[in-house]
Amino acid sequence: MNKWVRFTTTHKVENLYLEFYGTEKANTSRPSYLLARFLCTNSTSKLLSLRFCKFATKPTICWTSLTVLRISCASLTHDMIQNILLGSPALTELRLYNFVLQGENDFAFQGQNVVINSTSLKKLELDGEEDRAKNYGYATVEISAPNLLFLSISGFMYKRKFQLTNELSLVETKLGFECKSNDYGRNSSYLIYRNDLRELLLKLLHIPKLTISTWCL
């Protein structure tokens, strides 16, 4: 596989799709293609779509020409997301689909914040998978992207609090995520979720177009 991928980089392929197939679950025990170092420092790609691919724990990323990145069926840590954003200064569109957020080991994510910080980003789509984080504590996903125009949050986002920082330029937002709860502590969980959702909506009052699905309510 690495030989084929190297062929695409040496021939300066701009749109690269590495999409492998299997169950939709981003199961960390399932074999996934480990992204080669030379691909992570490829300066010619403008669009990169990854499915069932995985990054090194603390990857070195240098995608200076990349404008569109789509990652699906993957487990991501805070450090991975930070390195991706720092190494992609021209990135305008980021889509994370069927993904899970986790720590460097199975129990390291509890209470950890994830920051999505980018001045170039204009479109952000987050679609979460029902993951093992339901057994952990609450964690905050902080979105700091002053030039963001479109935001979509959907899928399973158990014990996730979304926080918008700085003044955003949003013109359209779609909220379709579900915060499932176990029977134990259900009332307190829903109370926390209700307060978090209210806080998020107050940040979105100025948005010209806001769509909220029944999952959120």
Summary of predicted features, one role per range:
Residues 144, 152-217:
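Extended repeat-based solenoid scaffolds, especially LRR ectodomains
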Residues 1-110, 115, 118, 128-137, ...:
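Leucine-rich repeat
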Residues 14-19, 46-51, 67-72, 92-97, ...:
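Conserved hydrophobic beta-strand positions in leucine-rich repeat
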Residues 113-117, 141-143, 164:
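Short C-terminal beta-strands that terminate individual repeats in beta-propeller domains
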Residues 44, 137-139, 158-160:
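Residue-level marker for the onset of beta-strands and adjacent loop->beta junctions
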